[in-house]
């Protein structure tokens, strides 16, 4: 779908009775009916928010699981933070992302083919990584650049890749001190002037799952009582968003939150399904599966996510 106004497009997966054939999406091919008429499913919409520099098609496996249970799935391309247009280094995208989810719901509601088949008063949201940050925002979380600065001052070494990205790694060598100095200097230069806090909720959103969310910039008190049911997926070997500072910190602050699934052997890229091929360098170290992790576990995780939405969106058993 075209994005509302001049916004980025929204990729939509939906139930259809048409014949399936190979459809190329980015680096992989899915079996789908690319132009088939949508049919009525369970009447509910789930919005998937991709990670930084990502794309909707890396969540195709989850989308297909949801569609098989009757959901329509909308996946906005987050402006300035997707594979075709990636401008890292600022919080511009994070300030827009939750609103882009709301606009994706608007786009579906304005589509003459889809709108009559859906009730948009109870929408689900799933987000991974920066998409998990988006999900936490929609759950009522308040965040600020200054909390990011404070976190990285206190935990720069332990949470290096969250604070600096995947440009370089700490190696234990003599250059590490210089890398830390440069990182601190850049963090303060870019963010010291932004003293605001940010948030955005949408009354149509009724259930949220955040997988490996970036959570350190949040005031955890704002997530102690989410505005809607909130579930988390945790990845035990995540080196990009170290769980103790992110997903586990949310679970510790939020007694009502549910751990939808835990993958103790999984790295950060586990929830990219399919995983992009040919990842190397520091990015490959962050996203490629660590030894001992089996992707055979992922279909069950997808089913648990779908079950969480079904419980909280009022959907009966398929």
Residue positions per predicted region:
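Hydrolases whose catalytic domains are alpha/beta-hydrolase-1, hotdog thioesterase
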Residues: 134-138, 219
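Gly/Ala-rich beta-loop-alpha elbow adjacent to hydrolase catalytic centers
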Residues: 127-131, 135
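Short substrate-entry loop that stabilizes the transition state in hydrolases
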Residues: 20, 34-43, 48-86, 239-243
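Catalytic nucleophile serine of serine hydrolases
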Residues: 51, 129, 212
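The feature captures the conserved acid-bearing segment of alpha/beta-hydrolase catalytic domains
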Residues: 172-257
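Domain-level recognition of soluble alpha/beta enzyme cores
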Residues: 1-46
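Alpha/beta-hydrolase active-site loop
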Residues: 90-116, 137, 142, 146-181, ...
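Active-site-adjacent alpha-helix of alpha/beta-hydrolase-fold enzymes
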Residues: 225-296
């Amino acid at each position: 779908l075209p994005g509302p106004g001049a916004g980025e497009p929204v990729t939509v997966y939906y139930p259809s009775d048409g014949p399936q054939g190979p459809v190329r999406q980015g680096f992989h091919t899915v079996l789908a009916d690319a132009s088939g008429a949508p049919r009525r499913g369970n009447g509910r919409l789930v919005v998937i928010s991709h990670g930084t520099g990502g794309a909707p098609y890396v969540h195709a496996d989850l989308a297909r699981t949801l569609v098989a249970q009757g959901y329509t799935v909308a996946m906005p391309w987050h402006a300035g933070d997707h594979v075709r247009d990636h401008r890292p280094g600022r919080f511009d995208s994070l300030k827009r992302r939750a609103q882009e989810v709301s606009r994706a719901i608007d786009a579906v509601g304005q589509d003459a083919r889809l709108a009559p088949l859906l009730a948009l008063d109870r929408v689900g949201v799933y987000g991974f990584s920066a998409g998990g940050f988006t999900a936490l925002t929609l759950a009522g979380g308040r965040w600020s650049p200054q909390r990011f600065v404070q976190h990285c001052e206190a935990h720069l070494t332990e949470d290096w890749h969250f604070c600096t990205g995947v440009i370089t790694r700490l190696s234990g060598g003599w250059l590490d001190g210089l890398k830390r100095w440069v990182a601190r200097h850049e963090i303060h230069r870019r963010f010291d002037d932004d003293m605001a806090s940010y948030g955005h909720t949408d009354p149509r959103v009724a259930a949220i799952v955040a997988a490996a969310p970036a959570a350190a910039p949040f005031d955890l008190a704002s997530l102690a009582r989410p505005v809607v049911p909130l579930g988390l997926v945790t990845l035990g070997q995540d080196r990009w968003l170290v769980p103790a500072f992110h997903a586990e910190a949310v679970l510790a602050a939020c007694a009502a939150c549910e751990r939808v699934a835990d993958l103790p052997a999984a790295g950060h890229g586990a929830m990219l399904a399919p995983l992009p091929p040919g990842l190397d360098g520091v990015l490959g170290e962050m996203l490629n599966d660590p030894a001992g992790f089996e992707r055979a576990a992922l279909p069950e995780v997808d089913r648990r996510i779908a079950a969480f939405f079904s419980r909280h969106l009022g959907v009966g058993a398929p």
